[in-house]
């Protein structure tokens, strides 16, 4: 059984026809986009890929931030190329916002998506695993399903492994 078949079987009772994937430039983006494409019904489905630039309160919300915009557009182009392998309609969008979590939830409402897919890196904060601030906000406030795709735990160096 392929990964696609196993994934589809898990959500078979509730077909997903539209998914919002949030990309950030992390290595987990590609896996998140592929996962979302595999969840979608291939006929008449829509994939929304969203890259958000968080704008500091010291700047106007519509400030032109050329380096961030260029990076976001490059990431969106890469993710669109990945989604072309799958047979779903893809829409990519770059959005400027003060708070990413709020913007993601609002986009999910505006687009009436069936699910949100977030790819998150494995990260630690103060020695403990952390999923950051955005994922908990989305899990709490999104009106639809939310799937988290976390990267594997990075291998520890032999020095760290032998001291614990």
Task: Tell me the role of every PLM-derived stretch.
Residues 37, 80, 105, 136:
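Active-site phosphate/pyrophosphate- and oxyanion-stabilizing loops and adjacent acidic/basic residues
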Residues 48-50, 91-95, 147:
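General small-molecule cofactor/ligand-binding pocket signal
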Residues 1-10, 14, 85-116, 153-158, ...:
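Structural beta-alpha unit
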Residues 51, 119-121, 150-151:
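Short secondary-structure boundary segments
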Residues 118-141, 155-159:
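Glycine-rich, Arg-bearing micro-motifs that act as flexible, cationic patches
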Residues 64-74:
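A short acidic, glycine-rich active-site loop
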Residues 8-66, 82-84, 88:
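Small/aliphatic-rich secondary-structure junction motif
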Residues 17, 114, 143:
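Conserved acidic residues
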């Amino acid at each position: 059984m392929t990964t696609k078949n196993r994934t589809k079987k898990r959500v078979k009772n509730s077909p997903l026809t539209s998914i919002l994937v949030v990309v950030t430039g992390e290595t987990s983006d590609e896996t998140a986009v592929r996962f979302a494409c595999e969840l979608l019904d291939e006929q008449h489905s829509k994939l929304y890929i969203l890259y958000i630039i968080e704008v500091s309160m010291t700047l106007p919300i519509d400030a032109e931030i050329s380096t961030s915009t260029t990076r976001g557009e490059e990431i969106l182009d890469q993710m669109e190329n990945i989604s072309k392998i799958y047979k779903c309609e893809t829409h990519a969008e770059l959005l400027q916002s003060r708070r990413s979590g709020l913007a993601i939830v609002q986009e999910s409402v505006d687009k009436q998506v069936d699910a949100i897919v977030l790819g998150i890196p494995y990260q630690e904060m103060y020695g403990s695993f952390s999923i950051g601030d955005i994922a908990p906000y989305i899990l709490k406030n999104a009106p639809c399903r939310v799937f988290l795709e976390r990267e594997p735990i990075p291998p520890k160096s032999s020095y760290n492994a032998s001291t614990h």
